[in-house]
Amino acid sequence: MRVQVVDPSAYTPPYDHALCAALARAGADVELVTSAFAYGSAPAPDGYRLHELFYRRARGPAGSRVRLATKLLEHIPDMLRYRSVATGADVVHFQWLTVQWLDRYLLPSRPTVLTAHDLLPREPRLAQVRAQRRLYGAVDAVIAHSDYGRRQLVLELGVDPARVRVIHHGAFEYLTRIAEGELPPELGADDPGGPVALFFGLLRPYKGLDVLLEAWRGLGEPGAELWIVGRPRMALEPLRVRLPRGVRWVPRFVSDAELAACFRRAEVVVLPYSSTERFDFSGVLATALAFGKPTVLSDVGGFGEVAATGAARLVPPRDPGPLRAALAELLGDPGLRSQLAEAARAAAAGPYSWDAAARRTLELYRELVG
């Protein structure tokens, strides 16, 4: 089976790498077709080939308007060039297609799969939602990461249920094999000694950081610290005016080595998201499972399906009271943390393993090829 996994903008290198490596272990001939990752180093190929075909002339800092403009200029020529490359594949598996109204006309004439990392475009307008719906209709199969995601695709976006397959997002266990390293310098050289709760990932309004800080304000756990680590995509100044005690910030993109150090040190990982209408899972949650970390999750999207494994505490979204209570319980009870950690490791080795995801993905490919 010759498979091309395609992520034009290199939005999710960890996911791309883990999927390609797992498909290769399962016997597929895999090529990752993407672009250079603008924020730092990406995982090295492991059993698959790498082809950085897209946006080779992109200029400007990562995330800048200049870089976006140069990528848009290259988009149509690169998608057309990719169509000639795709003739060597039995199946083409897109991870992202972000110019929805245009990309459906540029798909290669091969069996195509699209993973719905974002069920809807970010901050969607009506025209974007319509374009996303048409794009889903143009591919042969759509992958959701949870039953919740499947329901959203079918009920809200009108995708044919026969073309939607639920395949769990694998746990990022490759990150656990990174050598022991130093924490980000912003966290200080001295270990705080007390328990640490970690909030990790791009800082966006829907992730509930304001609710988390309010919950932390009333937490009575002595010596506990909250580490907020990730690149801001929102204004942080209003949140930093009255910070509660014990909060440390790393407001930037961190390396994989720093990421691994943060997760190893944390006792609890917290995802207090206020909404997941546009997506159904989280790479941060996949990382927490891989490291065997107990999690506190808002009851949104597909998070409840992970909590059902026993790996997480589930709390109502946008409510600091229950969030505070769950954090206090876990930070203060090592025995309970061990219980949830064991369930997290079992989930990462079982239903949320990349080998399980690869098996199900290959089954889908074979159905499409016939």
Give residue spans per PLM region.
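Donor nucleotide-sugar binding/catalytic pocket of nucleotide-sugar-dependent glycosyltransferases
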Residues: 137-178
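Conserved donor-binding/catalytic core segment of Leloir-type glycosyltransferases
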Residues: 189-207, 213-217, 226-227
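Nucleotide-activated donor-binding/catalytic signature segment of Leloir-type glycosyltransferases, i.e.
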Residues: 237-260, 268
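Acidic donor-binding loop of glycosyltransferase active sites
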Residues: 263-279, 293
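Conserved acidic donor-binding segment of nucleotide-sugar-dependent glycosyltransferases
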Residues: 309, 313-321, 329-335
